[in-house]
Amino acid sequence: ILFEGNEITQDDVLRREMRQFEGAWASDDKIEQSRVRLERLGFFKEVNVETVPVPGTDDQIDIKFRVEEETTGNVGGNLGYSDFGLMVGFNLQERNFLGTGNSVGIAINKSIYQEVYNLSFYDPYYTIDGASRGYSLYYRATDYGEFNIANYTSDSQGLGIQFGYPISDTQRIGLNLTYDKTDIDAGTLPVRDILDFLIEEGNSFSTVSAQ
């Protein structure tokens, strides 16, 4: 099995999608299934396949997959204005990081009252049999004084871990685990209700969830 046209994407990324195996009896159905799986990756504009007889033999063939790669990265930004001031944002997503088939994402959003940072990573083949694993991190700082609600701030951090396992060519089961932690700072002149709440409940809150 040969691959042509994948200048960025590594051969291993294509080979793990094969349902026709080298050294096995050739099957038109498995060859076509392999081609369709390459298309589903979303890394290629076009995927073609041909079978070529091996010179000097009458019972062997080479299978050649020709791919045309397409852009897998996206860069975006946003700019807005509300009653609370200017809002700006930036995001970067690469679905085929360094040709590994892994996905990496970064997002930053800032305004006068809030800053949010997100980072994500996803490996669709964490194990050889197609189990996937992903991570996501975030940090959010909010100044509620800018809302004219109350003069306090909060800092939140979170970690997410995602696992997936294929149960068919088109279906997967998954498990998402998340941990969130929020710290509240009442400031130098806190509102009495907020101060009473923090004295009773504390100023740090953590949650763990699974779904």
Task: Explain the meaning of each model-derived region.
Residues 2, 15, 32-35:
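Generic structural signal for individual residues within well-ordered alpha-helical segments
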Residues 8, 24-211:
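Gram-negative/organellar outer-membrane beta-barrel architecture
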Residues 8-22:
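N-terminal periplasmic "start-of-domain" segments of outer-membrane beta-barrel proteins
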